[in-house]
A protein has these predicted regions:
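Transmembrane beta-strand segments that form the barrel wall of outer-membrane beta-barrel proteins
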Residues: 26-40, 60-64, 344-352, 412-414, ...
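Residue-level marker for the onset of beta-strands and adjacent loop->beta junctions
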Residues: 47, 105-107, 327, 412, ...
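Face-selective signature of the C-terminal outer-membrane beta-barrel domain
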Residues: 121-139, 167-205, 211-356, 374, ...
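Signature for the C-terminal beta-barrel architecture of outer-membrane proteins
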Residues: 417-423, 443-483, 514
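Conserved C-terminal beta-signal and adjacent last beta-strands/turns
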Residues: 522-545, 551-656
């Protein structure tokens, strides 16, 4: 309410009103299902229980979900705690499976999942309310994969073939508690969040004739408090935000490969950020000034045992702190068909490194400008340009070796390094709601200048990735476009999306600096329609390629095709039939394609207004492998992933 007449939302408001007979009563939904599967060769289950009660003083929603059918419940937990990560730290140990492009995640997820969630809302006097949310997830998943990795080298390419089976156990407990006041004079909200997760991964591998075992323990503990205040004193608008966050990651990796190798890491930090914003509207001009400060206190320790000392230092013990001040003036102007915005953030960082003899003082200036011209009520052109300097990447700030998986070692920098960027983008947006035609096109060019250079060396059976303090440049082209239009004669619509990315960069490979280019194109066309009340249908076709070019070493380009369709038929009132199919054609190496066809079917029958019975048949043709190849930094990885086999599932849905 405090932003009324100042800020507009594109999200529609939804007001729900319960019938009198439904108030103060529990509303419950139950879903229970069972079936069989060819891979994994075991029984299937799927269950959901949803309970809700609405009272004048309080409201509650509680649910329990469980399945082993490939439905990912982890995303539902992450949605509750999702938010911007100000520190952007990552795990140093990384032994998990990579995501599969194009293919739905449930196809490759062999899981056994349980999720419990309960949320409460208490309404207080004077437009105050209290909310709480608690979630607990228990998940066990397995995966089977084969990979063939090629590292392109000036002398002779190195090829590594792996077969692995993994078992992952995850326990995650999240809690969210908030207090909110929404008044015309001010808005106040305080969020207290915590996330405790335990992730254990066991991997048995076969590389050529060698047997390898990996055991990774990756717990992560996080607590944060976020305060937001908005006030409207007259024509002025004042806001204040405060974020305090702490995180601890005590993680370990154990490798059995001829001998025992142990990697331990401890990464912990406390981060605080406070910011105030004062703005005023002066005719067509909006003027605002934001200022604040932040601080980070971080310790990183690691130790590596079981490798020869000749590879390098095996210990890290770093303390990295910084204090920062920020000031951001902003101007916004709107006159008839013209709009413009200017921002000029100025930041000061004081870094203190326990391992360095001197501290570091850094000033960062990141101005940007945005202009929009409405040539007609339906069409506008836009232009955006700016400069930016990113602060030090703390994740790469270490000097000793860290084992990320059984074969890969990494080494960072022991001194400050920054990345300076420039960008220029422009495009247009056209919308004609009457005819149902919408178009958006954007072209962006960017340049990056970095103080650090990534490199890769090979030592016996290990691959060492590292950073060195050396100036390097890269540049990128990005083109995005989308067009959608109503098709009245089909009672549907059609559209096309295009994404093109081209990047030029360099790296050090075995002491030689090598320039390379990567590119990708992804286009998707779609069309859907309806025939009376009987049939709904849709068809989608996607084409893409990814490319890797390196001077005198490699010039590769691989293509991918995907066709998919879905249709829903209602032959009689109580019967609903759904069919869905996918055809993938992936080029895994030059002129060698792998094809796979997947077909699913589902039939639902409404027994009563509160009861429905459904039968689902997944992967009708019982396909077992999905193959694809992706390019990296002077490397390519050919993947073969095991997918879920033919499955039959019966579900009963009851509304109590």
């Amino acid at each position: 309410k405090a932003l009324q007449d100042v800020s507009f939302s594109s999200q529609a408001a939804v007001n729900l009103r319960l019938k009198d007979k439904s108030k103060a009563k529990w509303v419950m939904n139950l879903l229970a299902g069972g079936g069989i599967s060819t891979h994994p060769d075991k029984g299937l289950w799927s269950g959901e229980l949803f309970a809700m009660q609405m009272k004048k003083e309080w409201q509650n929603i509680t649910l329990y979900k469980t399945n082993n059918t490939g439905k990912n419940l982890e995303t539902e937990v992450n949605d509750f705690i999702a938010g911007k990560d100000p520190v952007k730290l990552e795990d140093y140990i990384n032994v998990g499976n990579v995501s599969v492009p194009y293919l739905e995640k449930g196809r490759t997820l062999f899981n056994r999942s349980h999720l419990f969630s309960t949320g409460w809302l208490w309404g207080l006097k004077n437009e105050w309310e209290i909310r709480s949310q608690i979630n607990y997830l228990n998940d066990r998943s397995t995966a089977e994969a084969e990979t063939s990795t090629t590292y392109y080298r000036s002398v002779q390419d190195r090829i590594i073939h792996e077969e692995k089976q993994s078992v992952t156990h995850t326990d995650q407990l999240t809690a969210h508690f908030s207090v909110e006041a929404n008044k015309e004079a001010f808005y106040l909200k305080n969020n207290l969040k915590t996330s405790l997760s335990w992730n254990d991964i066991n991997i048995s591998m076969q590389e050529d004739a060698s047997g390898i075992m990996q055991q990774a323990s990756q717990p992560q503990y996080k607590v944060s408090n976020d305060l937001q205040l908005i006030k409207r004193p007259g024509k002025w608008l004042f806001s204040f935000t405060a974020l305090n966050e702490g995180q601890w990651r005590p993680q370990s990796l154990r490798v059995e490969w001829g001998n025992t190798i142990r990697q331990r890491t401890k990464d912990r930090y406390f981060y605080t950020h406070e910011e105030a914003n004062l703005g005023i509207q002066w005719g067509r001009l909006n003027i605002s000034l934001a200022g604040g400060g932040s601080a980070l206190f971080r310790d990183f320790d690691s130790s590596l045992e079981g490798l020869p000392d000749s590879l390098g230092t095996m210990i890290n013990a770093l303390t990295t702190n910084y204090q920062s001040l920020q000031l951001t003036p902003k101007l916004e102007y709107k006159r008839k068909r013209w709009e413009g915005k200017l921002e000029a953030p100025l930041q000061y960082y004081h870094y203190s490194f326990a391992h360095a003899a001197t501290n570091k003082h850094v000033y960062l200036f990141s101005p940007s400008a945005y202009f929009r011209w409405h040539t007609t009520p339906k069409l506008y052109l836009f232009l955006r340009a700016g400069l930016s300097t990113d602060p030090c990447d703390l994740h790469s700030l270490y000097n000793g070796l860290v084992m990320t998986d059984y074969r890969t070692l990494s080494r960072g920098l022991n001194e400050y390094a920054a990345v300076k960027s420039r960008f220029l983008s422009g495009g247009f947006n056209y919308k004609n709601p009457v005819k149902g035609l919408f178009t958006h096109v954007m072209v962006m060019r960017s340049w990056d200048d970095s103080d650090k250079q990534y490199g890769r060396d090979f030592s016996d059976k290990y691959i060492i990735g590292y950073y060195t303090h050396h100036p390097t440049t890269s540049n990128n082209w990005t083109i995005m476009g989308t067009v959608t239009s109503n098709l009245d004669f089909l009672h549907g619509m059609a559209g096309i999306n295009v994404m093109y990315i081209n990047s030029e960069q360099s790296m050090i490979s075995e002491n030689d600096r090598t320039s390379f280019r990567t590119g990708s194109l992804h286009t998707t066309g779609r069309i859907n329609g309806r025939i009376g009340e009987i049939l709904n249908w849709q068809y989608r076709v996607s084409y893409g390629w990814n490319r890797l070019d390196a001077d005198e070493q490699v010039n590769r380009k691989l293509e991918q095709w995907c066709h998919s369709f879905a249709m829903t038929v209602v032959p009689v009132t109580r019967v609903n039939v759904q069919l869905a199919g996918e055809y993938y054609r992936n080029e895994v190496s030059e002129n060698i394609f792998k094809d796979i066809v997947l077909l699913d079917a589902k039939c639902s029958y409404t027994l009563t207004p509160h009861t429905e019975l459904s039968a689902t048949l997944m992967n009708v043709f019982n396909r077992k492998k999905y193959s694809y190849t992706i390019y990296g930094q002077l490397s390519s990885v050919e993947h073969y992933r095991r997918i879920r086999g033919r499955e039959f599932l019966l579900n009963l849905y009851v509304k109590l």
